Swiss-Prot record:
Major localization class: cytoplasm
Protein name: 5'-nucleotidase SurE
Domain of life, per lineage: Bacteria
Cofactor annotation remark: Binds 1 divalent metal cation per subunit.
Classification via PANTHER family: 5'-NUCLEOTIDASE SURE, 5'_3'-NUCLEOTIDASE SURE
NCBIfam families noted in UniProt: PRK00346.1-4, PRK13931.1, surE
Compartmental location: Cytoplasm
GO cellular component: cytoplasm
Residues binding a divalent metal cation, per UniProt: D8, D9, S43, N96
Record EC number: 3.1.3.5
Keyword rRNA-binding: no
Keywords: Cytoplasm, Hydrolase, Metal-binding, Nucleotide-binding
Length: 261
C-alpha cells in the first residue's frame, strides 16, 4: 500500500510523527509512506490553495518533503510532482493537535488536506487528537491517537467505505481527550456545533503605538449537540464522521424553490 500523509501543524509537528507511525503500520514492510507537509504551521487555513504565488518545496529525506504552502497545496504537490504520477492508495491528514469536530471542521487545514485528496478521487481521512484536562498530565498527549489510530483507519479500509463514483466523500476522525486505556470505543456521529464558541478578536497595542488584533477562539470543552462529534468525544469515544465537499443544504432546496423559484 502506498500512503501519502500531510498535516496543517507543519513538518516538525509531533502529531505528524504519530501519523507516520500509523501509516507505517498500515502500509506494512512492502508498502510506501510519503510525507509532504507544510514547512510552517498552517492551522486554520481550511482548504486554501496558493495559486497566486509560487510554492517552494524541499526534499528533507527519503519520501519526505516540506512545502511552503497549505495542506491542500501539499496534496497537489505530491500528486502532480513528488510522486511523479504514482497514485497513493490512501491519503491521511493529521494528527492534528486539538480537535477538528463541530464548527472547527470549517476552519481546519487538516480537514482541507483530506478534502483536496477526496476531490482528486482518493480515499482520504483527517485525524485529530482532542485535548483536555485528562491529556494535560500525559507524557504523550497524542497517546489515544497513537495507540488506536491504525485500528480505526483499518476499520474504515476493511469495510470498503469508499465508492469510486463518490469522489467527494472522505472521513473525519477525532480521538477523545482521554488516556488510551480509557477509550470507550468509537461512534459514527454527525458534525456538531458549539453555539457559544465562535471566534472573536482581542485588540492590543504594540510598544510603538500601533493597534493590532489577535483572533481568539472559544472554549473547546463547551457542550454541543448530543450525539454529534464533539459530544461523543467528550464522552470518551472516537468520532467518525463522513463528510463531503458538497456544502449544499439539500433539505432546503425544495422550500427555497417554492418561495422564490
Amino acid at each position: 500500500m502506498r500512503i501519502l500523509i500531510t498535516n496543517d501543524d507543519g513538518i516538525n509537528a509531533p502529531g505528524l510523527e504519530v501519523l507516520e507511525q500509523i501509516a507505517l503500520e498500515l502500509a506494512g514492510p512492502d508498502g510506501e509512506v510519503w510525507t509532504v507537509a507544510p514547512a510552517f504551521e498552517q492551522s486554520g487555513v481550511s482548504h486554501a490553495i496558493s495559486y497566486t504565488h509560487p510554492m517552494m518545496i524541499a526534499k528533507l529525506g527519503p519520501r519526505r518533503y516540506a512545502a511552503e504552502g497549505s495542506p491542500a497545496d501539499c496534496v497537489l504537490a505530491a500528486l502532480y510532482d513528488v510522486l511523479q504520477g504514482a497514485r497513493p492508495d490512501l491519503v491521511l491528514s493529521g494528527v492534528n493537535r486539538g480537535n477538528n469536530s463541530a464548527e472547527n471542521v470549517l476552519y481546519s487545514g487538516t480537514v482541507g488536506g483530506a478534502l483536496e485528496a477526496a476531490l482528486q478521487g482518493l480515499p482520504a481521512i483527517a485525524l485529530s487528537q482532542f485535548l483536555g484536562p485528562e491529556t494535560e498530565g500525559l507524557a504523550d498527549p497524542f497517546e489515544c491517537a497513537r495507540t488506536h489510530g491504525a485500528r480505526i483507519v483499518r476499520l474504515l479500509l476493511e469495510r470498503g467505505l469508499w465508492d469510486g463514483e463518490d469522489y467527494r466523500l472522505f472521513y473525519n476522525v477525532n480521538f477523545p481527550p482521554v488516556p488510551a486505556a480509557n477509550l470507550r470505543g468509537h461512534r459514527v456521529a454527525a458534525q456538531g456545533f458549539r453555539r457559544d464558541t465562535s471566534f472573536g478578536v482581542e485588540p492590543h497595542m504594540s510598544p510603538s503605538g500601533r493597534r493590532f488584533l489577535w483572533i481568539r477562539g472559544g472554549a473547546q470543552q463547551s457542550p454541543t449537540l448530543p450525539g454529534t462529534d464533539a459530544a461523543v468525544n467528550l464522552e470518551g469515544f472516537v468520532s467518525i464522521t463522513p463528510l463531503r465537499a458538497d456544502l449544499t443544504a439539500h433539505d432546503r432546496l425544495a422550500e427555497l424553490e417554492a418561495l422564490i423559484g
